[in-house]
Amino acid sequence: MSGVNDIRSTFLDYFKKNGHEIVPSSPLVPRNDPTLMFTNAGMVQFKNVFTGLEKRPYSTATTSQKCVRAGGKHNDLDNVGYTARHLTFFEMLGNFSFGDYFKENAIELAWKLVTEGFDLPKNRLLVTVYSEDEEAATLWKKIAGFSDDKIIRISTSDNFWQMGDTGPCGPCSEIFIDQGENVWGGPPGSPEEDGDRFLEFWNLVFMQFEQTEPGVRNPLPRPSIDTGMGLERMACILQGVQSVFDTDLFRTLIGTIEDTMGVKAEGSASHRVIADHLRSSAFLIADGVLPSNEGRGYVLRRIMRRAMRHAQLLGAKEPLVYKLLPTLVQQMGRAYPELVRAEALISETLKLEENRFRKTLERGLSLLSDATTDLAKGDMLDGETAFKLYDTYGFPLDLTQDALRAREIGVDISGFTDAMQRQKAEARSHWAGSGEKATETVWFELKEKHGATEFLGYDTETAEGVVQAIVKDGAVAAEASAGDKVQIVVSQTPFYGESGGQMGDTGVISSDHGKIEISDTQKRGEGLFVHQGTVVDGVFKDGDAVVLTVDHARRSRLRANHSATHLLHEALREVLGTHVAQKGSLVAPERLRFDVSHPKPMSAEELKIVEDMANEIVLQNSPVTTRLMSVDDAIAEGAMALFGEKYGDEVRVVAMGEGVRGAKAGKPYSIELCGGTHVGATGQIGLIRVLGESAVGAGVRRIEAVTGESAREYLAEQDERVKTLAASLKVQPGEVLSRVEALMDERRKLEKELADAKRKLAMGGGQGGSVDAVREVAGVKFLGKAISGVDPKDLKGLADDGKTSIGSGVVALVGVSDDGKASAVVAVTPDLVQRYSAVDLVRIASAALGGKGGGGRPDMAQAGGPDGSKADEAIEAVAVALAG
């Protein structure tokens, strides 16, 4: 039962038997929580439940939560590999009560699992409680039979948890195990508490207060429980090891590294770093994070590049980390099926990133070596060099620090920061200054003054409103007249502001006094709609009553294209796998494109199936429905939330089509959180035509398509091309393909005949230089010839012909191209390869042509040189070598 997978199952099954709902791990990217970069605790997905903002259909739960601590204030990256317990990725086991049971039940459940489920010896266990929580101390005595010396009272914040400056909070009780006198350290609260003898493995948080302001706490009417047990730490205890890297899961991963690299671990930090970083990288990619130069993507890139640097330390000359992925999937795929679903994407992303970084890694390490040649233990690398490594070679600062760690050389962080700030200042100085920053202040002030614009565009394309502000050249203006380019804010609008990939609406704003042609609509700040346009005639002022009219035809095409992206997105997930997630989109009137996570190009057959599946839903002409609900309710119903999008408390859920196969049969085909405009029924899309797909980055593919009238125009153009081609070929349109194939066969035949004729002409003396074609040198037949205008790739074929014609001997040919460069081939017949090496002879010819090197086999070798005028001299040089 002591294996990692067994421990996880034992924990979850125990709490399930005790009435808890097993809730799947939430993604590593927290939903709707901008305060966190990554999920780092089990309670994160329940934060709104604890605060009362969200209701769940259960009052007790248990989870095994994926967690990452890298980046932000919770960052263990620098320590991983060098300590026994630091990890960037770990699993947090937990049980939770949302106003159900409280302190006594929580302690009793924990005690029974620890002593009966995990069979830990009672005499080695002890606990801490908050110094003011006498209730917890009394309960531990009652339930566990602990004496006072086994209950340690802690007065610091270590044993009092709070969500923030305000909100739910409460005392903690931590469970420790004594690992024995042979391990250094003292009990919690003692001067030696940082030692490893007394190991904390489970923290029970009793949420019983609400803090309304610092120091002011009121009892909660329904207190709750939040607990967290580190899975890897419990594995250490049950498996009797001091380091997480000696547990079964890590031993397997490290064993795969040893087998792949042929290098034993023997306490190597590099093996540990690679094993841990593979886990965090794989799970982050599976949850939608891809390497980039900002935000979460940059943290992932730092983790990946640190692993790659340690792979290089082990001697890796080719990408290594992706080769370890199957072992991880085998170990953890059953508990986390997203790893299995995204395996191809993870593998390709790791491989692409390793290939991209490998060359700069070598150059950067060379620069680092040169820069630190004269540095000794305790010295500091200057910040300028560290910044150059970051800026030019893609070395994150922590990678440079890690590379110097073994030599105990530090990095001047202040100097690094100064260098970065100087670069930013220089970049700003080169900026022409569009006034955008000042304009952003204007929008903030207008939002504060007028509030958000009321959007009416889901229900109408025409509305009346009142002008609230006119902005010209980045500043609020009193009025605008004919010819002025303006940005205008109105009290309410049917115009859609660009967001979610959908372009903003165009149209007309008119009044009794004039007209403004609107060329774009944008959103500024939180919900301020800004209409950009030109005053055609009249004068406009604040307070004017206006009529806003959206360009109906353009909006209709935008609706069709936006709805088509939803259908294509779902079809892609069905055809390629559920790892497919939208990474960006453009919904324009005439076309659409969107980027999705997928590791490799799609085949023509896959594109056709995706297109057919989407059009199948179009032909249903089924209604498109929209509903408002909470994010969690929407996701519970199967709605897809797009990675990186921020959602409010209430979201708009768009559903369309009816599934006809598999698990979706009879259910909505596509259901997504979306604030865009859509068709009323799928038939209004008309037709979807996929134009193609391409790469836009590591693990990201771009799909482009047209719909409706644009699709009809595209197909009409294609049809016209086929008719024109058929007329040129003098066949019917349906016969074009067979006629083209026949012409291609005929062309290949003629090209072969032409090549044969060229070879015969070349070897027959018609294009040769001044050297005799065949002669005897040192008793060996030697065919040496310089040939003009021959393709270098044909030289080997000519050399083979030459060998056939002379039977036994050496052939040396030099081809001179139109730009004066030369290619040389030397061939030796089988009976002479022990005497002459074609490689040695072709290098002699190359030297005569001003080149270097050359290579091949003993019987056939090729080289080149820049000086074709020395072709005859190259032939003679080979002849001299034969005679020598």
From Swiss-Prot:
SMART domains on file: tRNA_SAD
GO biological processes: alanyl-tRNA aminoacylation; negative regulation of DNA-templated transcription
PROSITE patterns (UniProt xref): AA_TRNA_LIGASE_II_ALA (PS50860)
Highest taxon in the source lineage: Bacteria
A GO MF term: alanine-tRNA ligase activity
Listed InterPro entries: aa-tRNA-synth_II/BPL/LPL (IPR045864), Ala-tRNA-lgiase_IIc (IPR002318), Ala-tRNA-ligase_IIc_anticod-bd (IPR018162), Ala-tRNA-synth_IIc_core (IPR018165), Ala-tRNA-synth_IIc_N (IPR018164), Ala-tRNA_ligase (IPR050058), Ala_tRNA_ligase_euk/bac (IPR023033), DHHA1_dom (IPR003156)
Entry's localization field: Cytoplasm
Enzyme Commission designation: 6.1.1.7
SUPFAM superfamilies linked: Class II aaRS and biotin synthetases, Putative anticodon-binding domain of alanyl-tRNA synthetase (AlaRS), ThrRS/AlaRS common domain, Translation proteins
KW Signal (keyword) present: no
Reaction catalysis annotation: tRNA(Ala) + L-alanine + ATP = L-alanyl-tRNA(Ala) + AMP + diphosphate
Amino-acid positions noted as binding Zn(2+) in the UniProt annotation, renumbered to this chain: H562, H566, C674, H678
Enzyme class: ligase
Cofactor(s) listed in the protein's UniProt record: Zn(2+)
Cellular component terms per the entry's GO annotation: cytosol
UniProt KW keywords: Aminoacyl-tRNA synthetase, ATP-binding, Cytoplasm, Ligase, Metal-binding, Nucleotide-binding, Protein biosynthesis, RNA-binding, tRNA-binding, Zinc
Cofactor note: Binds 1 zinc ion per subunit.
Family: Belongs to the class-II aminoacyl-tRNA synthetase family.
Biological function: Catalyzes the attachment of alanine to tRNA(Ala) in a two-step reaction: alanine is first activated by ATP to form Ala-AMP and then transferred to the acceptor end of tRNA(Ala). Also edits incorrectly charged Ser-tRNA(Ala) and Gly-tRNA(Ala) via its editing domain.
Domain notes: Consists of three domains; the N-terminal catalytic domain, the editing domain and the C-terminal C-Ala domain. The editing domain removes incorrectly charged amino acids, while the C-Ala domain, along with tRNA(Ala), serves as a bridge to cooperatively bring together the editing and aminoacylation centers thus stimulating deacylation of misacylated tRNAs.
HAMAP family: Ala_tRNA_synth_B
Protein name, UniProt field: Alanine--tRNA ligase
